Amino acid sequence: DLHPRVRRQRQMCIRDSTGGIQTTGNYMGRARTPEQLMADMEEAMRLMPGTAKLNIHASYAIFAPGEFADRDALEPKHFAKWVEFAKKHHMGIDFNPTFFSHEKVKDGQTLSSPDEETRRFWINHGKACIRISEYFAKETGVPCVMNIWTGDGFKDVPADRMGPRMRYKDSIEQILSEPYDHNLVKPCVESKVFGIGVESYTVGSAEFTLSFAALHDGCMPLMDNGHYHPLEYVSDKIPAMLCFYPEFALHITRGVRWDSDHVLILDDETKEMAKEIVRDNALDRVYMALDYFDASINRVSALATGFRSWQKALLIALCTPNAMLKALQDTNQMSKLMVMNEAVKMLPIGEIWDEYLRREGVVDDLHFYDEIEKYENEVLEKRN
C-alpha cells in the first residue's frame, strides 16, 4: 500500500539516477522492500568479522501504508525501523542526505541552483537530515557522520564557475545553522572531479570542500578515492590531511578508470590507504566508510567481500613493522628499506587472518562463497 509518490521516487532512484551516478547489471535477487534489504544485510554481516556500522541514505525512509513525506519534510519517525535494526545488531548509523534522483533536481542542480525555490527545498532537506542524524546518535549512542554530497555540475563548459559555488557555500552554511550537538553529529562535505553528464564542471570540487571544511568548525572533509583523477592517490592525501584536520572521513572504493565504484578488493591502493591510517596513528581520527555498488554480481557477496577486504588491509597495516621502516627512511637506508618492504609482503598474514575469523566465529575465505550460494538458492532466487 505504497503512496503513489513513494512508488515514483523509488522508481526514480532505480531507473533514473541522477548526479553522475551509474551502476550496471541486473543480478537476481534485488531487494524490493526494506525488510528484504535488512535480511540481505543480516546475511552479509554474518560473514563479516569485527564491528560494522550502518550507513543509509535519506531515500531509505520507511513510510506507513499510504503515508508520504517529501525529502524536505522527512522526520526521525520515518527512520525508526532503521534504528530498531541498528540496535538489534549493536550498530551506530551514519547518514546521507539524498540530493539526487528526485523531480526537484532542476537542470542538474540542487544546493547550487539559481532557482531559489529549488535551492530552498534542498536546504530544508539538509536541515531535516541534521535532525535525523542527531536522532540516530541519541538512539544508538554512537556519533552519526552526516555526509553532504551533490552531483551538481554541468555537462559542458560553464560561463560562470564561481556563482554556483557561492550559492553552494551559502546553502551548506544554512544547513549547518540547524542546531545540533557537535558531539553527536559529525557533518562532512565530499568532493568529486566529475560524473556522467557533469563531465566539464562539478560544483563541489576538492578545493571547494577542503576550504569549506577548514573554515567551518565542526565540519569535516570527506575524500572518496574514486572521486579524483586516476593518477591521484588518496593514500598520499591522507597524511597531508592529518597535518591540518583533527578528523576527516573516507569513502573507500575501487575506481576502474573512473568513479566506477567496483567492489573493494585487496589491491595496492586499498592496502596503502590502510597503511597510512595505521602508521600515522590515525585510527581514531579517520571515519572509514565503504562505498561501492555492482548490480552484476550477488549483492550479499559484494557487501561482505568489500568489508572483508578492508579488514584484511587494516590487518596487514597493523602487522607491518612501521617503526623499523620509518627508521630506515630517516637514516637514508633506502636500499635496505626496499628489501624490507618486499620481505614484509611475504609475512604469513593469512594465518593471522584465519585465526581472527575463527575467534570471530566467521567462515574462512575458502568456504565463504558456500554460504553465499546457500542464501542465493534459499532466498534470492525466490524473489524473481
Predicted regions and their residues:
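Active-site beta-loop-alpha junctions enriched in small/polar residues
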Residues: 57-61, 98-100, 151-155, 190-196, ...
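Glycine-rich, proline-tolerant flexible connector loops at the mouths of alpha/beta enzymes
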Residues: 24-32, 55-75
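Single conserved hydrophobic/aromatic residue that forms the stacking wall/gate
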Residues: 1-10, 14
